[in-house]
Regions:
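Small/aliphatic-rich secondary-structure junction motif
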Residues: 1-51, 146-195, 220
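A short, acidic, amphipathic alpha-helical segment used as a generic capping/interface helix at domain edges
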Residues: 212, 230-241
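Charged docking surfaces used in two-component/phosphorelay signaling
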Residues: 84-93, 229-233
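Nucleotide-activated donor-binding/catalytic signature segment of Leloir-type glycosyltransferases, i.e.
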Residues: 212-224
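General small-molecule cofactor/ligand-binding pocket signal
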Residues: 33-35, 81-85, 132, 181-183, ...
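Gly/Ser-rich helix-loop-strand patches that form or flank binding pockets
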Residues: 94-143, 240-285
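A short acidic, glycine-rich active-site loop
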Residues: 52-66, 200-207
């Protein structure tokens, strides 16, 4: 293990995943390999000519390889393995290859600073290894790693996911020299808050008392433990912005089949707002 799968899409990405990924690989003591994806359609009569299609494919892959190898050379990383893949669907090859060949972290830059594209969501939904999505946003320039966990769950699968998020968050914070912050959201709809039917402060104090032992096990300072109330997607976004979190770590329960394609889970609602570099820790249902 200790292998990092770096996806290079330099011409379209919002930030340089290769440079950031290789720097992070050194911090995490992982062996990085770079994967570049390319694919193109031929139009008209040319699309039915296998020989011409093969020539075009080879030319595109060679061009991509030369560009990336030159970039690796500028980073003093000429020895880092480079693979150029001809694939229509990036996520299918990346998820399968990473799992089969023992990679334990996948790194990719997002295309836009303010939202993910379908390929990013497909990776989130299908990856079996942790996925780090990088952005270059001025909101994430703080020295903070924020993790989100569900302290109130009694579901064994969610509890295991909590532990995985904590472990990866600690490892990332230590490697990057950032301060670890932990967030737990008591989900209370805004309409209930507006009706003033609940004593919010009492609920927060009760949560701190109930989860005192787990908080102590995590080992963060008191001012780095945040129990907040509201809708997770909004609360966590606001907290990450306030902390200027460089990294945000969240667990994602992956849904397969039609249900997973139609109904986004809480993690996806959170990620649709987040502006930090996001580390997604997957789990199977």
């Amino acid at each position: 293990m200790n292998k990092m799968f770096v996806i290079a899409q330099m011409e379209r990405a919002h930030t340089d995943a290769v440079a950031h990924g290789l720097a992070l690989a050194k911090q995490l003591n992982k062996q990085a390999e770079v994967f570049a994806y390319t694919y193109a359609y031929l139009s008209g009569a040319d699309r039915d000519n296998p020989r011409l299609a093969g020539v075009a494919q080879k030319a595109l892959m060679t061009q991509q390889e030369k560009q990336l190898q030159a970039h690796l050379d500028t980073l003093d990383a000429e020895d880092v393995p480079l693979h150029v893949i001809w694939s229509k669907y990036l996520f299918e090859h990346a998820c399968s290859h990473a799992q089969r060949h023992g990679f334990d972290l996948m790194v990719k830059a997002v295309h836009h600073a303010d939202h993910y594209l379908p390929t990013d969501w497909q990776l989130i939904r299908h990856t079996s290894v942790p996925l780090l999505l990088l952005t270059n946003n001025p909101l994430n320039n703080g020295q903070t790693t924020l993790i989100s966990i569900d302290l109130g769950t009694r579901n064994p699968a969610k509890q295991r996911l909590n532990d995985a998020v904590i472990a990866h968050g600690k490892q990332l914070a230590k490697a990057t020299g950032t301060k670890l912050h932990v967030a737990y959201v008591l989900r209370i709809p805004q309409i209930v808050r507006d009706m003033d039917l609940l004593d919010i402060n009492a609920l927060v104090k009760k949560a701190y008392a109930e989860h005192k032992q787990k908080i102590a096990e995590i080992g963060v300072d008191a001012d780095c433990m945040h129990i907040i109330t509201g809708e997770p997607e909004l609360c966590l976004f606001e907290l990450a912005c306030r902390l200027k979190s460089q990294y945000f770590v969240v667990g994602a329960r992956q849904r397969q089949g039609l249900l997973g394609r139609i109904i986004g889970n809480t993690a996806e609602e959170i990620l649709s707002r987040m502006r930090s570099n996001v580390l997604v820790i997957p789990t199977e249902e």
